């Protein structure tokens, strides 16, 4: 059975986006430690602008976590018995964290960036069992074309 929680590292989903990470690390630690104590076994982490992506560092803001810091935090979560699951919200109504790319929906460049980010996060999270991509608000007609590959 999955007993988990959605945690937000990044918050730039809507306007106006901030140029810094709006995140309280002490609260994060308190919540995740309590998750381990009460037997929660999964944390879905909405990353957004909270990570310096190796392929697209231009998406970072002041205070974004480095890949090394993220890996260390993932190791700590796993030691608490909490499986970290990444979430990259690509929904067209929650994508301000993508900066200029959020205005390039359905273009080849957009799909290249999305593929790069998914690859970065899959590697940093050590090939997670699940990967949340957002899009739960989207309909099949929202995006006019799909990637060629």
Regions found by a protein language model. Name each.
Residues 1-3:
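Extreme N-terminal starter segment of soluble prokaryotic enzymes
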Residues 6-149:
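Aromatic-lined carbohydrate-binding surfaces of glycoside hydrolases
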């Amino acid at each position: 059975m999955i007993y988990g929680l959605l945690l937000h590292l990044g918050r730039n989903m809507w306007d106006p986006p901030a140029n810094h990470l709006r995140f309280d690390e002490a609260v994060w630690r308190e919540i995740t430690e309590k998750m381990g104590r009460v037997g929660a076994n999964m944390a879905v982490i909405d990353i957004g602008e909270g990570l310096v992506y190796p392929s697209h560092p231009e998406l970072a803001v002041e205070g974004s976590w480095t890949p090394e810091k993220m890996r260390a935090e993932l190791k700590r979560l796993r030691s608490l018995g909490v499986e970290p699951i990444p979430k990259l919200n690509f929904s067209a109504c929650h994508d301000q964290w993508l900066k200029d790319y959020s205005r390039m929906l359905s273009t080849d460049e957009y799909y290249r960036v999305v593929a790069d980010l998914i690859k970065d996060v899959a590697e940093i999270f050590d090939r997670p069992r699940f990967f949340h991509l957002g899009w739960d608000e989207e309909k099949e007609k929202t995006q006019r074309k799909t990637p060629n590959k």
